[in-house]
A protein has these predicted regions:
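C-terminal motif of bacterial Sec signal peptides marking the signal peptidase cleavage site
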Residues: 15-17
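Short, linear, compositionally biased motifs with a strong N-terminal bias
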Residues: 10-13
Length: 136
């Protein structure tokens, strides 16, 4: 009887450790997706950045991205993020520095990002528009 009790305790500990590893992996995947999005904008790979965006509301459309070649992103920083476990989303704040190519003006913009996890595909997607850069 005593060994069954210890076996149950060990099993519970292992299961809770597995859940922690799964959540940690999920967090690592989110960070990788966020980095991909921001690096893609930085290096003018706008199609790659757009591929990260998938709206939960399928009626929503991505705005045209062809005007983005008028700016150059010079820096990006993930300022903070807040997870919402109820609907498996994370709201993050990113700060982008950029230059208007024609004028040479330097700007900064804060971008609120809503990330959601697709359980079927086991991937994170951005449910927000591209940053609202001043193009001219």
């Amino acid at each position: 009887m005593k060994s069954i009790k210890w076996l149950c305790v060990a099993l519970i500990m292992m299961l809770s450790a597995c859940a922690h590893v799964t959540e940690q992996k999920k967090q690592e995947h989110l960070e990788a997706k966020q980095k991909l999005f921001m690096k893609a904008l930085r290096w003018k790979s706008y199609e790659t950045a757009a591929s990260v965006i998938r709206y939960r509301n399928t009626a929503r459309q991505l705005a045209p991205i062809d005007g983005l070649d008028k700016i150059t992103v010079t820096s990006y920083d993930l300022v903070g993020s807040v997870p919402n476990t109820e609907d498996d989303t994370v709201v993050a704040q990113a700060l982008f520095g950029y230059i208007q190519n024609e004028t040479g003006r330097v700007y900064q913009i804060k971008h609120t990002q809503v990330w959601w996890f697709d359980d079927e595909l086991k991937q994170w997607f951005l449910d927000s528009d591209m940053p609202d850069f001043k193009l001219d």
